UniProtKB/Swiss-Prot annotation:
<feature type="domain" description="NPH3">
    <location>
        <begin position="199"/>
        <end position="476"/>
    </location>
</feature>
<feature type="region of interest" description="Disordered">
    <location>
        <begin position="477"/>
        <end position="502"/>
    </location>
</feature>
<comment type="similarity">
    <text>Belongs to the NPH3 family.</text>
</comment>
<dbReference type="InterPro" id="IPR011333">
    <property type="entry name" value="SKP1/BTB/POZ_sf"/>
</dbReference>
<comment type="pathway">
    <text>Protein modification; protein ubiquitination.</text>
</comment>
<comment type="function">
    <text>May act as a substrate-specific adapter of an E3 ubiquitin-protein ligase complex (CUL3-RBX1-BTB) which mediates the ubiquitination and subsequent proteasomal degradation of target proteins.</text>
</comment>
<dbReference type="InterPro" id="IPR043454">
    <property type="entry name" value="NPH3/RPT2-like"/>
</dbReference>
<dbReference type="Pfam" id="PF00651">
    <property type="entry name" value="BTB"/>
</dbReference>
<keyword id="KW-0833">Ubl conjugation pathway</keyword>
<protein>
    <recommendedName>
        <fullName>BTB/POZ domain-containing protein At5g47800</fullName>
    </recommendedName>
</protein>
<feature type="domain" description="BTB">
    <location>
        <begin position="28"/>
        <end position="96"/>
    </location>
</feature>
<dbReference type="Pfam" id="PF03000">
    <property type="entry name" value="NPH3"/>
</dbReference>
<dbReference type="InterPro" id="IPR000210">
    <property type="entry name" value="BTB/POZ_dom"/>
</dbReference>
<dbReference type="GO" id="GO:0016567">
    <property type="term" value="P:protein ubiquitination"/>
</dbReference>
<feature type="region of interest" description="Disordered">
    <location>
        <begin position="524"/>
        <end position="559"/>
    </location>
</feature>
<dbReference type="InterPro" id="IPR027356">
    <property type="entry name" value="NPH3_dom"/>
</dbReference>
<feature type="compositionally biased region" description="Low complexity">
    <location>
        <begin position="477"/>
        <end position="489"/>
    </location>
</feature>
Length: 559
């Protein structure tokens, strides 16, 4: 930081009650009142250097004590005292922290060269241009200090000059950056660096007021020099700096009762940041967008802001990670941990866009679209596995999200099966009908042999799902060409998987002996409501007699 020292005499001001008095043998003849502070001074020192005081004291006798109120002086009593000390040649230290107040106050008092040669105002202006604007952090600190005197600083051009200086340095090639800057990314300090990172400037400007930050970013973008990703990184750093719960996945962050003033500040920040996000896809990460959507709901951001965030999030949903989706629910009416409604809304927007693109593109371009939706389907199934572990997760929300994924998106149902199994394990109290609803979207034909074998033995699964798994297990185990051909014919014509016991018996071509046993299994399961029917230590063997071959399936039921 740059400093300027003016004056040679020691500070002899002292405070007595609400007055500031100078230690001197000369009686005071000038009283300056600024709000609740009174200064007892001398006309002979201040009037020659202050054009305003000279004009106010012109018609007064020299022997009279003059009292003047300067309640409107910019910077208040502190700024006036700096100017007064200069008039007494008392040492004052100026830096980016107090320069703006001193500049505005000296301008108010008309302490120019035309009033007295070598006056304070030209000295301050020279320091501002030759030192402050040449420094990186000095320019930022000075710009931030203009928030206390916005009109004065605008009229004096301080704001514009500081912004121009900051933007010029942001656009400087990293190989030429030699000034001190703040960069505290995790692990950065431990690595050896041969060059300055491209986003070296983002942390320092995050100290700025929101409006000033917006002005700097807007000015930088107007040069069309910075890539969108750098703008996005600056927005991310700023949001993390001013939203205390943005970086945390803790669910306690949303439970803190904030006052309306804090909510309004955060609401304004979210609205402003969203409007500044570059239109270029990938300018900000999907995780950043999803967390903004969550916070936008919490702070009650405008509908326009939330709609735009959901649209942007859906464009990049395939880039999301599971951690990105695990956003806390901040609704006081819900007990479950995760905001599944938010994920469902973004997924719905993604699917609308995907269907629109699929119908518009030629078949040659559909490979990428298919890859995209399958990647999203895997992500959603992983998300379902995570939220299934929440004991308060309603069946309806789980089912709604699992069924939102189109059939074409899931090449395999192994992940979905795992999610359903976790849900059944964590929620053993759910009814038979709810179990059926959970498994409604599960296609046993798309289960791997290993997972299907697990499903056959899974006591938690509804009987219908177990029988379907048995059916497809037989189909996959059949070695005869005719059996494979028949199975292929059955499902390539769009027919549904047999779900009732009679059609299942028919499709499996059960012989008389095995039919009775299988039917007993079905009836027993229905009567007992999915209760355990076999001992794990004494597994029963059910022999399914197909056409020309026998297949033995051991069903082990744990009590």
């Amino acid at each position: 930081m740059k400093f300027m020292k003016i004056g040679t005499k020691p500070d002899t001001f002292y405070t007595q009650e609400a007055s500031r008095i100078l230690i001197t043998d000369t009686p005071n003849d000038l009283v300056i009142r600024i709000n609740n502070t009174t200064y007892h001074l001398h006309r002979s020192c201040l009037v020659p250097k202050c054009g305003l005081l000279r004009r106010l004291c012109t018609d007064l006798e020299e022997s009279d004590t003059v009292t003047i109120e300067l309640n409107d002086i910019p910077g208040g009593a502190d700024a006036f005292e700096l100017c007064a000390k200069f008039c007494y040649d008392i040492t004052i230290n100026l830096s980016a922290h107090n320069l703006v107040n001193a500049l505005c106050a000296s301008k108010f008092l008309r302490m120019s060269d035309s009033v007295d040669k070598g006056n304070l105002l030209p000295k301050l202006e020279a320091f501002f241009h030759s030192c402050i604007l040449q420094g990186w952090k000095d320019s930022i600190v000075t710009l931030q200090s203009t928030t206390k005197l916005p009109e004065w600083c605008e009229n004096l051009g301080i704001v514009r000059k500081c912004i121009d200086s900051i933007v010029e340095k942001i656009l400087t090639p990293t190989s030429e950056v030699s000034w001190s800057h703040t960069y505290t990314r995790p692990g950065y300090a431990k690595r050896q660096h041969h060059s300055v990172p491209r986003d070296w400037w983002t942390e320092d400007i995050s100290d700025l007021d929101l409006d000033l930050f917006r002005c700097v970013i807007t000015a930088a973008r107007s040069t069309f020099t910075l890539p969108p990703q750098l703008i996005g990184e600056a927005l991310h750093v700023y949001t993390c700096r001013w939203l205390p719960y943005f970086k945390s996945n803790s669910h306690s962050g949303f439970s803190v009762k904030e006052n309306e003033a804090a909510l309004e500040r955060h609401r304004r920040l979210v609205n402003t940041v969203v409007n500044m996000i570059p239109a270029d896809k990938g300018s900000v990460s999907e995780g950043f967008l999803l967390r903004l959507v969550s916070i936008a709901s919490y702070v009650r951001a405008s509908l326009t802001t939330k709609t735009e965030l959901i649209r942007k999030s859906s464009l990049q949903l395939e880039e999301a990670t599971l951690e990105d989706l695990l956003l806390p629910s901040h609704s006081s009416s819900h007990l479950h941990r995760y905001d599944t409604d938010l994920v469902a809304t973004v997924l719905e927007s993604f699917l609308m866009l995907w269907r629109r693109q699929s119908s518009a593109h030629l078949s040659s371009n559909n490979t990428q679209l298919l890859h995209s939706i399958r990647k999203v389907a895997k992500l959603i199934d992983s998300y379902l596995q995570a939220v299934a572990q929440d004991v308060h997760m309603p069946v309806s929300k789980f089912v709604s999200l699992s069924e939102a994924v189109p059939d074409i998106a899931r090449q395999s149902h192994d992940r979905l099966y795992k999610a359903i199994n976790i849900f059944l394990k964590v929620h053993p109290e759910i009814s038979k009908e709810e179990k059926k609803r959970l498994c409604r979207s599960l296609d046993c034909q798309k289960l791997s042999a290993q997972v299907r074998a697990h499903a056959v033995k899974n006591e938690r699964m509804p009987l219908r799902t177990v029988v379907q798994a048995l059916f497809f297990d037989q189909e996959s185990g059949s070695k005869g060409a005719s059996s494979r051909s028949e199975s292929q014919e059955l499902f390539t014509r769009g027919k549904e998987t047999p779900t009732d016991e009679h059609s299942m018996m028919h499709k499996l071509h059960l012989g008389p002996a095995s039919t009775g046993k299988a039917k007993n299994v079905l009836e027993e399961g229905c009567k007992r409501g999915e209760e355990k029917t076999r001992s794990s230590t004494d597994p029963k063997k059910i022999v399914w007699k197909g056409t020309g071959s026998e297949h033995k399936h051991h069903i082990s039921r744990d009590r």
